[in-house]
UniProtKB/Swiss-Prot annotation:
Signal sequence range: 1-30
UniProt-annotated location(s): Endoplasmic reticulum-Golgi intermediate compartment membrane; Golgi apparatus membrane; Endoplasmic reticulum membrane
Source lineage: Eukaryota, Metazoa, Chordata, Craniata, Vertebrata
Name of the gene encoding the protein in the UniProt record: LMAN1
InterPro entries membership: ConA-like_dom_sf, Intracellular_Lectin-GPT, Lectin_leg
Annotated S-S bridges: C190-C230
Motif (ER export motif): 509-510
CDD domains for the chain: lectin_ERGIC-53_ERGL
A single GO BP: protein transport
Protein name (Swiss-Prot/TrEMBL): Protein ERGIC-53
Organism: Chlorocebus aethiops (Green monkey)
Function statement: Mannose-specific lectin. May recognize sugar residues of glycoproteins, glycolipids, or glycosylphosphatidyl inositol anchors and may be involved in the sorting or recycling of proteins, lipids, or both. The LMAN1-MCFD2 complex forms a specific cargo receptor for the ER-to-Golgi transport of selected proteins.
Length: 510
C-alpha cells in the first residue's frame, strides 16, 4: 500500500516538473538567459591569504593568519566577534596584504544577534585602498577610497527603512552621512532583515566586469546556496589594489556581530588564461611536511589498533542499513524532484528580481528624458509626440505590475512546495495531492501572465482604444420614489400602533 502511494506521488511530480520546465523555457528562451549556464561562467580560484574560516581559526598567540584585527574585535577558534553586545563598541578585521584582482568574489557568513527588537549600529564589508582599522563608520575609518557594503540595523533618519543593505562608494573625499543612513550617497540598496535568524546569514559580493552585485541568503533555511538578488551597481570603479575587511559598531543599543567565515575568490573571464599558481615550496619544506605526515599517520594507525582491541564486538558486523529498499529509493526520487522544482522556482524568482530592477531603471531614465524634451523642446517638429511617449511609459508600468504579480505567484508556489515537503502522517496523501493541484494552478497563472506580458509588449506601439460605454440604465422616477416612501411610512406607523395595543392588553392581566 505504501509503495503504491509513493508511485502515485512520483507520477504526480513528473508532469508537474515538466510543466515547470516548459514555463521556464518560454520565459527565458527569447533573450538567451536560459542558455547553457556554464558557458559564460568565470573561472574561480580560491585565495587563502585573503580568507578565514573555522575551526582552529586563531593561532596560539591569538592572531588570525594573514589578517589583522583592531578595536574590540575578539577572535576565537570558530569565529571572530567583531563587536560584542556592549554599548559603544567598535571593532574591525582586515587583510594584511593588498589584493590585486581585476575581478573577485567574496562569501561572508555572519550572525547579528541581540535581545532587543531593534539593533544597532550594524556591520560593514569593505574593499578599500588602505586599512580603516578604527573609526566612526560602522567601526571603520571615514573618507575611505573604495566601496563599502553596509548592513545597517538602526534607523537614524526615522523613515522606517531599516534593517537595510546599502552600497556606498567613496573616493576618499566624502564624509559619510550617518544621520541620514547615507541615503543621498547610496548607489543601490535593499531592505532585508538579517538579525536573529535561525541559521547564519550569508552575503555573496561579486565584482565582475566593473559590475558589483550583492546576493543575500537570509538564514531561514540551512541551504547554503539559497541566495536571492539584493542590489547591483554597474560601471563601478574601485582601486586596482586594496584590502578586504569587516567592521562593526554598537551604540546605545547593542548586538553581537559575529563573522564565521570570509572566503575570497579570484575570477577570470572565459577565454583568458587562469592566474599562475604560487611558487612551489622548497625541498626542505617538503621533507618537513612529509615527516609530519608520516608521524600523524603512525599515530592514527596506533589509535585504530587500540580502538579495535577495546571494541572487538564492533568488528565484522554486516552493514545492512547501508543499502536502501525499493520504497526508500522511490521516496528519495520524489523528494529529489521536489527539490529540483524548488531550485528552479528560486532561479526564476532571482531572474524576475533582476528584470524588475532593469525595468525600474529604464522607466526612470525614460521619464527624465520625457520631462527634458517637454521642457526644452515643446514645439520642435520630427520628435515623438507626447501621447506616444505617455503610451510607452504606461506600457512599462503595466510590465512592472505583471512582473510583480508573477513574483507574488512564484512566492506562493515556493511556500506551497515548502509545506509539501513536511506532510502529516495521517492525511499526507490527500494534502500532498491538494498541494500539487495548487502548484499546478499557480504555474498556469504564471504561464498566462507571461503570455499576456509578451502580447502587451508586442502591441505596445499600437494606440490604445477605449471601450465603448454601456447604455446608461434607467433610474427610478420621483413619483414612484415618493409613493414608495409614503407606503413604507404608513406600514411602519400601523405596526407601532398594533404593538402598543398588544402591550396594553397584556398589562390588564397584571
Amino acid at each position: 500500500m505504501a509503495g503504491s502511494r509513493r508511485r502515485g506521488l512520483q507520477a504526480r511530480v513528473r508532469p508537474l516538473f515538466c510543466a515547470l520546465l516548459l514555463s521556464l523555457s518560454r520565459f527565458v528562451g527569447g533573450d538567451g538567459v536560459g542558455g547553457d549556464p556554464a558557458a559564460g561562467l568565470p573561472h574561480r580560484r580560491f585565495e587563502y591569504k585573503y580568507s578565514f574560516k573555522g575551526p582552529h581559526l586563531v593561532q596560539s598567540d591569538g592572531t588570525v593568519p594573514f589578517w589583522a584585527h583592531a578595536g574590540n574585535a575578539i577572535p576565537s577558534s570558530d569565529q571572530i566577534r567583531v563587536a560584542p553586545s556592549l554599548k559603544s563598541q567598535r571593532g574591525s578585521v582586515w587583510t594584511k596584504a593588498k589584493a590585486a584582482f581585476e575581478n573577485w568574489e567574496v562569501e561572508v557568513t555572519f550572525r547579528v544577534t541581540g535581545r532587543g527588537r531593534i539593533g544597532a549600529d550594524g556591520l560593514a564589508i569593505w574593499y578599500t585602498e588602505n586599512q580603516g582599522l578604527e573609526g566612526p563608520v560602522f567601526g571603520s575609518a571615514d573618507l575611505w577610497n573604495g566601496v563599502g557594503i553596509f548592513f545597517d540595523s538602526f534607523d537614524n533618519d526615522g523613515k522606517k527603512n531599516n534593517p537595510a543593505i546599502v552600497i556606498i562608494g567613496n573616493n576618499g573625499q566624502i564624509h559619510y552621512d550617518h544621520q541620514n543612513d547615507g541615503a543621498s550617497q547610496a548607489l543601490a540598496s535593499c531592505q532585508r532583515d538579517f538579525r536573529n535568524k535561525p541559521y547564519p546569514v550569508r552575503a555573496k559580493i561579486i565584482y565582475y566586469q566593473k559590475t558589483l552585485t550583492v546576493m543575500i541568503n537570509n538564514g531561514f533555511t540551512p541551504d547554503k546556496n539559497d541566495y536571492e538578488f539584493c542590489a547591483k551597481v554597474e560601471n563601478m570603479i574601485i582601486p586596482a589594489q586594496g584590502h578586504f575587511g569587516v567592521s562593526a559598531a554598537t551604540g546605545g543599543l547593542a548586538d553581537d556581530h559575529d563573522v564565521l567565515s570570509f572566503l575570497t575568490f579570484q575570477l577570470t573571464e572565459p577565454g583568458k588564461e587562469p592566474p599562475t599558481p604560487d611558487k612551489e615550496i622548497s625541498e626542505k619544506e617538503k621533507e618537513k611536511y612529509q615527516e609530519e605526515f608520516e608521524h600523524f599517520q603512525q599515530e592514527l594507525d596506533k589509535k585504530k589498533e587500540e580502538f579495535q582491541k577495546g571494541h572487538p564486538d564492533l568488528q565484522g558486523q554486516p552493514a545492512e542499513e547501508i543499502f536502501e529498499s525499493v520504497g526508500d529509493r522511490e521516496l528519495r526520487q520524489v523528494f529529489e524532484g521536489q527539490n529540483r522544482i524548488h531550485l528552479e522556482i528560486k532561479q526564476l524568482n532571482r531572474q524576475l528580481d533582476m528584470i524588475l530592477d532593469e525595468q525600474r531603471r529604464y522607466v526612470s531614465s525614460l521619464t527624465e528624458e520625457i520631462s527634458k524634451r517637454g521642457a526644452g523642446m515643446p514645439g520642435q517638429h520630427g520628435q515623438i509626440s507626447q501621447q506616444e511617449l505617455d503610451t510607452v511609459v504606461k506600457t512599462q508600468h503595466e510590465i512592472l505590475r505583471q512582473v510583480n504579480e508573477m513574483k507574488n505567484s512564484m512566492s506562493e508556489t515556493v511556500r506551497l512546495v515548502s509545506g509539501m515537503q513536511h506532510p502529516g502522517s495521517a492525511g499526507g496523501v490527500y494534502e500532498t495531492a491538494q498541494h500539487f493541484a495548487d502548484i499546478k494552478e499557480h504555474l498556469h497563472t504564471v504561464k498566462r501572465d507571461i503570455d499576456n506580458l509578451v502580447q502587451r509588449h508586442m502591441l505596445s506601439n499600437e494606440k490604445p482604444k477605449c471601450p465603448e460605454l454601456p447604455p446608461f440604465p434607467s433610474c427610478l422616477s420621483t413619483v414612484h420614489f415618493i409613493i414608495f416612501v409614503v407606503v413604507q411610512t404608513v406600514l411602519f406607523i400601523g405596526y407601532i400602533m398594533y404593538r402598543s395595543q398588544q402591550e396594553a392588553a397584556a398589562k390588564k392581566f397584571f
